């Protein structure tokens, strides 16, 4: 409460002028209110919105952080003006958010939009952080790309600049591909095949207007988008082949904008 009052004072705004408070949390959220076990914060299942609203005397809405970021990007970011879109965040893991008619699709259990845990391989032997095998996150995240690279380098002795690096990063792979390294280009193609195929599967279900790609891996830029779009088009109906792919633009502010939009949507 003290922190909220301090922020209002800094902005020269009275509490009466505030429509509500939006919060993004790293975990499933039901009914814009109940957090269903937020492991990263050490929370069990409880009604965050009701608890906080009683303390501050304002309406409170809660959303999954990835979903909230997606809402922000569709409102004021790379997907500005889009009412039906999907955001994919490629970082240490793979996150996502689905926006339909301008609102978050959270699902019955609050787990909607967990794109990173779509199964994309039946032959994977290593386990994902979620405990399953063959998740998209194991291939399209920054750590997944590094894993694929190490496997590729161990498979043969093909000449590549990546071998000279003490610790390969996803950025190294994309930079090498841009510089003409054949092995790196093959790796980018593989990431594009897997991610493009996964997004194609999403498209045949919800037919979004666009996909917004964010997270650290998205800094690779057009070389990533080109690889993804190529394989996306191979997976979808002809009418969906012109679905837009854009880069996210809000960075860490996406969640802030999304939290505000949650409140405006409800009011």
Feature annotation, model-predicted:
Residues 1-20, 29-34, 50-60, 72-82, ...:
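ATP-binding/phosphotransfer module of carbohydrate and carboxylate kinases, centering on a glycine-rich
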Residues 25, 31, 64, 100-101:
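A cytosolic small-molecule/anion-sensing beta-strand core signal
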Residues 35-42:
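Short glycine-enriched, charge-decorated loop/helix-capping segments at active-site entrances
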Residues 65, 91, 259:
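Active-site glycine-centered loops adjacent to acidic/histidine catalytic or metal-binding residues
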Residues 85-88:
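Two-metal-ion RNase H-like nuclease active-site motif
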Residues 95-99:
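Short beta-strand scaffold segments in enzyme catalytic cores
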Residues 111-115:
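Structural signature of FAD isoalloxazine-binding scaffolds in flavoprotein oxidoreductases
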């Amino acid at each position: 409460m003290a922190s909220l009052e301090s922020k209002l004072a800094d902005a020269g705004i009275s509490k009466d002028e505030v429509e509500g408070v939006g919060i993004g949390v790293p975990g499933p959220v039901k009914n814009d209110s109940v957090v269903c076990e937020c492991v990263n914060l050490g929370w069990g299942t409880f009604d965050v919105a009701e608890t906080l609203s009683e303390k501050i005397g304002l309406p409170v809405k809660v959303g999954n952080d990835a979903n909230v970021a997606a809402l922000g990007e569709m409102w004021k970011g790379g997907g500005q003006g889009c009412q039906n879109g999907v955001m994919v965040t490629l970082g240490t893991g793979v996150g996502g958010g689905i926006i339909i008619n301008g609102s978050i699709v959270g699902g019955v259990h609050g787990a909607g939009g967990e794109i990173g845990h779509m199964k994309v391989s039946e032959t994977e032997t290593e386990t994902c952080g979620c405990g399953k095998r063959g998740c998209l996150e194991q291939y399209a995240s920054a750590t997944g790309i590094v894993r694929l690279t190490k496997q590729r380098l161990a498979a043969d002795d093909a000449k590549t600049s990546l071998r000279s690096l003490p610790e390969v990063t996803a950025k190294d792979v994309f930079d090498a591909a841009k510089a003409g390294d054949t092995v790196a280009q093959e790796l980018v193609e593989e990431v594009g095949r897997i991610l493009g195929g996964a997004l194609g599967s999403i498209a045949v279900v919800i037919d979004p207007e666009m996909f917004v790609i964010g997270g650290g891996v998205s800094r690779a830029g057009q070389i990533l988008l080109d690889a993804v779009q190529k394989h996306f088009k191979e997976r979808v109906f002809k009418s969906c082949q012109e679905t837009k792919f854009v880069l996210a633009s809000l960075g860490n502010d996406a969640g802030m904008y999304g939290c505000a939009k949650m409140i405006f949507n409800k009011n």
